[in-house]
Amino acid sequence: ARTTLDDPHTRHTPHTATVGKARASPEERAYPILRQHDVDYVLIIFGGLLGYSGDDLNKFLWMIRISQGLWPDEIKEHKFFTSSGEYRVADEASPTLRDSLMYKMTYHRYNELFGGQAGMDRARNSRGPSTSPPLATLDEGFTSDGWLVRVYQVKIEDALGRALSAAQ
């Protein structure tokens, strides 16, 4: 039986902080965290297509805050906001948010539903990004019809030691 690193019933702050750190980090920093914890799959809940506001992206700031409590030198909440102090998800999103694994998993291929254009994110009443964020360390394994459930498989390390982005 496989264990779950973190779920809604987790009361152990370091576990939640670790999941938050992986999701808040750029792929190249998130991948070693996922591998260190033997993660095979990553599940996210995305309500942008259906208008479900209880999704992971809306809960993401809590993950960031909890992670910042353990890693204040690495995770900084203010970097996820725009220069005007807003939590925006479209092309106006901060570079830190756009580079995060969470953002990439959320919006990967989303604009394909809208003919390659920025699609409407109904959960945040905002446009999504105009281009699909690329993923180098995860493969999309499953996306439900309404895009509410998305599952990604963590890629296995390259046998030749190359970066996954170079080994594709």
Briefly describe each language-model feature range.
Residues 1-168:
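Extracytoplasmic
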